[in-house]
């Protein structure tokens, strides 16, 4: 078996493993933390929502973090078999075959895959799940927040500056709330992480006043670590609905795919 992996172990590939080598590697990889791709000559049996069998042939197996399983043949875009989640996985070898069994508890489903040869096994570990948005750019989101703070942030804020330069960088929005407090807003179009919190903290620290300054991080989601850091720094988080922000910013637009969601 030829095996290559990154120094930190986040991704790698094993080429032409024996059945025993493939089993040993998959027992380590199928722990729910890696995206695993297996290519080889395999057959499958499924029982659950219905029942199906695919005979031995070229197959591509994808196992995602969290247990989603997808089995593809060489043609078309529809999978031969799939399961949305897995409760338990078994890896075994017998009679020259590598056997993988993926069990789902509720509703009960079992997907069994038997491979006579493996061409390669590839894997990658994702430390943080990203997000895919098609609604708007970050500039659009910042404009929507500036124009519609009541609808998106839940309070009236009068903004008087955008992308104001500070020693820590450009702060997205500066404003004043209903009580006269200075408000600094950092906008993120994707899930906010700890670096976004530190950005906002720097902007608040840089503001030249002894009065109270509120720092608000605006994003569609926030990681647990970022939320803990945010709260420890006395900052605030507002969850924003991107679809709502888009509709507020584009009230006169023609019909788009969003109208059918």
Curated annotation (Swiss-Prot):
Taxonomy, superkingdom: Archaea
Entry GO terms, CC: cytoplasm
Keywords attached to this entry: Cytoplasm, DNA-binding, Endonuclease, Hydrolase, Nuclease
E.C. number(s) listed in UniProt: 3.1.-.-
Keyword rRNA-binding: no
Molecular functions per Gene Ontology: DNA binding; single-stranded DNA endodeoxyribonuclease activity
CDD domains in alphabetical order: NucS-like
InterPro entries given in the database record: Endonuclease_NucS (IPR002793), NucS_C (IPR048301), NucS_N (IPR048302), NucS_N_sf (IPR049173), tRNA_endonuc-like_dom_sf (IPR011856)
Principal location class: cytoplasm
Subcellular location(s) per record: Cytoplasm
The keyword Signal is assigned to this record: no
Listed PANTHER family: ENDONUCLEASE NUCS
Function: Cleaves both 3' and 5' ssDNA extremities of branched DNA structures.
Similarity section: Belongs to the NucS endonuclease family.
Protein's UniProt name: Endonuclease NucS
Gene: nucS
